[in-house]
Every structure is written in structure tokens, then in C-alpha cells.
Amino acid sequence: MEFLLDSANPEEIRQAWAMGVIGGITTNPSLVAKEGRDFHQLLQELVQIVNGPISAEVIALDTEGMLGEARELAAMHPNIVVKIPMTEEGLKAVKVLKAEGIKTNVTLVFSAVQALLAARAGATYVSPFLGRLDDIGENGLLLLADICEVFGVHGLETKVIAASIRNPVHVTEAAKIGADYATVPFNVLCQLFKHPLTEAGIKKFLADWQKLK
């Protein structure tokens, strides 16, 4: 399983990229709005930081509007992946974009059959949202397992991105289930490096070393 960073903050992205563990980033309108900057100018900065897929989402809800935005985004840089919402209009757009060679990430997926439809429409990636399902008392990891099983049974090439990651347990379980990617917020990524026994071990090694002096 590969890691993506779920962020539109250039400083977070620089730090995460320097760690050497992420292969790309995902953004959404909410993350971009937090930055308070022009969307296209922000993307132009991000493609200079990360040499990997960068998911950028359309705002339009109709097929033609999505196609117009998608083509504009894709023309900015070869690494741009266009995020499309999981709707009927969205899947119509995905089919056209697939034929045009534009990569897509179908987002806001909350059922295995939605993921299957997206794959059949030609999506490059699908993004099931784990945390948001957990929030309403459902099991996001079970959804992820169902999607990975269905895709495996039918030999689908669409890649699965575990999204709406809330904690390190989500990351571990996503890897065990077989997700192709996990897109993690910066705070969760930082948590993955830490373990109390690692920190205690470092302190002990240093203390023992000091005794030699």
C-alpha cells in the first residue's frame, strides 16, 4: 500500500514529501478553501513540490460543467488527477474523460456497488470514505474490504484509495485489507512514526552511551 497526503497546505506537503514516504496528494474543496487562495495558483505551487499524482476536485454538478473544469485542470500538469463526485452525472463525465486519457478519482464513495459502477465507467481511482461511515455508526473498513474483494474477483484495474482516514488503526487495517493507497491527513501521518517503546528505546540507548564517557 502506498501513502498519499490529504492536504492542500504547501508547508505540510513539503514536510511530508521530505519524509520520503508519500507518493502524491489528494485535495478537496474544503481543504483548498482553508488555504484562502486561488485554486489554480495553489495547484501550480503544489505540482512543483510533489512529483506524483495530485487529485484536484471539480465543483460543477452537471456533466458538461465537470468536463470543462476537468479538461482545464488536466491541462495544468500531467500529474493532475481530476476528482469527480460519485453521481450519475459524474460517471458520465468519467466515461468521456477516460476516452480522452484524463485520469480520474471518483470520490465520496460509500458503497461497494458505487465503487463498481465507477470502475466500469473508467475511473482510474475510487475513494471510499472510511471515517465518515464510522461517524454514522457504519463500518468504513468493512466497506473497504468489500470493494477490494469485488475488484479482485472481477480483475478490475481501478485503484482503491482508502480516504477519510482518522487514525493509525485505519491505516493499518487498510493495508491488511489490500487498499492500493491510503490518503492520510498530516496529523495522522505524523502519528504513524511514533511509538512509546521506540522513544523509550532511544532514550535508553543514549543514556547507556553517555555512561561510556
Curated annotation (Swiss-Prot):
It catalyses: D-sedoheptulose 7-phosphate + D-glyceraldehyde 3-phosphate = D-erythrose 4-phosphate + beta-D-fructose 6-phosphate. The keyword Cytoplasm applies. The active site is at K83 (schiff-base intermediate with substrate). It is an enzyme of class 2 (transferase). The keyword Cytoplasm applies. Transmembrane segments: none annotated. PROSITE patterns: TRANSALDOLASE_1, TRANSALDOLASE_2. Pathway: Carbohydrate degradation; pentose phosphate pathway; D-glyceraldehyde 3-phosphate and beta-D-fructose 6-phosphate from D-ribose 5-phosphate and D-xylulose 5-phosphate (non-oxidative stage): step 2/3. It comes from the Bacteria. One of its GO terms (molecular function) is transaldolase activity. It is found in: Cytoplasm. Transaldolase is important for the balance of metabolites in the pentose-phosphate pathway. Belongs to the transaldolase family. Type 3B subfamily. NCBIfam families: fsa_talC_mipB. This is Probable transaldolase. It comes from Desulfitobacterium hafniense (strain Y51). The lineage of its organism: Bacteria, Bacillati, Bacillota, Clostridia, Eubacteriales. The gene is tal.
